[in-house]
């Protein structure tokens, strides 16, 4: 689950096809990310947040989790809010992760 499953490919920006359900989203722009089996994998540390080797997922209702094995922590924040990648939800996610 926490191993690169897409070889040399990288996670690209998520472009919406249903704007009333989701905004376009790109988590940690400019940083290399991979897909594992069921999660996004970080290949480098994110500023103010998780370590390289961390895994994460996001759901349509602005539900998010991450696991950082190097630091021995995990975080879960669940909202029921549309559209996905709502700017206020992303700001709350960022503040929550920085606080942990």
Per-segment meaning from a language model:
Residues 1-100:
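Catalytic loop of the DD-peptidase/beta-lactamase superfamily, centered on the K-T-G motif
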């Amino acid at each position: 689950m926490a191993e690169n499953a897409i070889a040399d490919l990288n996670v690209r920006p998520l472009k919406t096809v249903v704007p009333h359900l989701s905004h376009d989203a790109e988590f940690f722009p400019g940083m290399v990310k991979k897909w594992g089996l069921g999660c996004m994998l970080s290949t480098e540390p994110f500023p103010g947040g998780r370590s390289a080797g961390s895994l994460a997922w996001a759901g349509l209702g602005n539900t998010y989790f991450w696991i950082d094995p190097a630091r021995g922590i995990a975080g879960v924040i669940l909202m029921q809010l549309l559209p996905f990648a709502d700017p206020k939800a992303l700001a709350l996610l960022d503040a929550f992760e920085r606080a942990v």
